[in-house]
Curated annotation (Swiss-Prot):
Manner of cofactor binding, per the entry note: Binds 2 heme b groups non-covalently.
Pfam families given in the database record: Cytochrom_B_C, Cytochrome_B
SUPFAM superfamilies the UniProt entry points to: a domain/subunit of cytochrome bc1 complex (Ubiquinol-cytochrome c reductase) (SSF81648), Transmembrane di-heme cytochromes (SSF81342)
MF GO annotations: metal ion binding; ubiquinol-cytochrome-c reductase activity
Protein's UniProt name: Cytochrome b
Gene that produces this protein: MT-CYB
Naturally occurring in which organism (per UniProt): Aerodramus vulcanorum
Length: 380
């Protein structure tokens, strides 16, 4: 009898073990869909991005016009651009939900998988930031100026770093060229990191909502979860297409329709909505170096999650106090996002400072405390 090709061919065997015959816990819920949705987002962004790059010119004099040309004169250029811009928003929605799921169900205890995931998040944030600069509108220019200037807070080498990032003494043509090169390159790095992330995940197998070992109850990925993922794709792509076709500029900033002008500073510089929580934390500290450290810590704190797990139960499924704390953290992040979009004035300053303090308190102090307390309560 001939051997089954998908099980014997060296390349097909890898695909088979990752996507077809992969043993998967039978009880994983829809929260486990976001990994495949992120893969879909990445593929969509790379394809639309390549098509946009064919018509884009990374030069300060014509960058803005080349984007307008793509939307007006290229076949379906408007649709490709709208899908790419709004696809980034969906990418971040999916990654935040994916991280939230990992946090709620204790997936961070697969330490290598979790750490590569955090590196993926940081790379995605860098990619989105350099991408936002490319249309060379007012917000693009001033966003680039403000965020790259943060490096100047680093003692001793700060100013040198900033000038190196700018490629000169201000944000200008070398900056735009460099950012375009990075924006083209980083998605492929993300794709490579994704493969590492998946390889490490398949070493341990997926976690599940109960947080218990599920080796005795696993089913093949295909057809059960491939079908479930297909439904997830449809559920995600429908609102993405709706947004791109009916209200493409809903999540953007109107000021980015004005070409970049170094002589006119916008009254309120703010990043895209998915960075607002971190921006609010940055602004909540009056000192520049302190703000930069808090901004960095707001994301890097995720690396500490495995060490701050003090409960004997893996997931929060049966831990009501931790659940309350988790949803308080979610509400707190929404407050930070809202505050980040507001001008720097009373009462937003104090709200931002309180929300930033709460964010770090919940993650670094309350979660370990409550985890240990719940374990103690179980023993009584």
């Amino acid at each position: 009898m001939d051997p089954n090709l998908r099980k014997s061919h060296p390349l097909l065997k890898m695909i088979n073990n990752s996507l077809i015959d992969l043993p998967t816990p039978s009880n994983i819920s829809a929260w486990w869909n976001f990994g495949s949705l992120l893969g879909t987002c990445l593929a969509t962004q790379i394809i639309t991005g390549l098509l946009l790059a064919m018509h884009y010119t990374a030069d300060t004099t014509v960058a803005f016009s080349s984007v307008a040309h793509t939307c007006r004169n290229v076949q379906y250029g408007w649709l490709i651009r709208n899908l790419h811009a709004n696809g980034a928003s969906f990418f971040f929605i999916c990654i935040y939900l994916h991280i939230g799921r990992g946090f709620y169900y204790g997936s961070y205890l697969y330490q290598e998988t979790w750490n590569t995931g955090v590196v993926l998040l940081l790379t995605l944030m860098a990619t989105a930031f350099v991408g936002y600069v490319l249309p060379w509108g007012q917000m693009s220019f001033w966003g680039a100026t403000v965020i790259t200037n943060l490096f100047s807070a680093i003692p001793y080498i700060g100013q040198t770093l900033v000038e190196w990032a700018w490629g000169g003494f201000s944000v200008d043509n070398p900056t735009l060229t460099g950012f375009f090169a990075l924006h083209f390159l980083l998605p492929f790095l993300i794709a490579g990191l994704t493969l590492i992330h998946l390889t490490l995940l398949h070493e341990s197998g997926s976690n599940n909502p109960l947080g218990i070992v599920s080796n005795c109850d696993k089913i093949p990925f295909h057809p059960y979860f491939s079908t479930k993922d297909l439904l997830g794709f449809i559920i995600m792509l429908t609102p993405l297409m709706t947004l791109a076709l009916f209200s493409p500029n809903l999540l953007g900033d109107p000021k980015n329709f004005t070409p970049a002008n170094p002589l006119v500073t916008p009254p309120h510089i703010k990043p895209e909505w998915y960075f607002l929580f971190a921006y609010a934390i940055l602004r909540s500290i009056p000192n520049q170096l302190g703000g930069v450290l808090a901004l960095t810590a707001s994301v890097l704190v995720l690396f500490l999650s495995p060490f701050l797990h003090k409960s004997k139960q893996r997931t929060m499924t049966f831990r009501p106090l931790s659940q309350i704390l988790f949803w308080t953290l979610v509400a707190n992040l929404l407050i930070l996002t809202w505050v980040g979009s507001q001008p720097v004035e009373h009462p937003f300053i104090i709200i931002g400072q309180l929300a930033s303090l709460t964010y770090f308190t919940i993650l670094l102090i309350l979660f370990p405390l409550i985890g240990a307390l719940e374990y103690k309560m179980l023993n009584y």
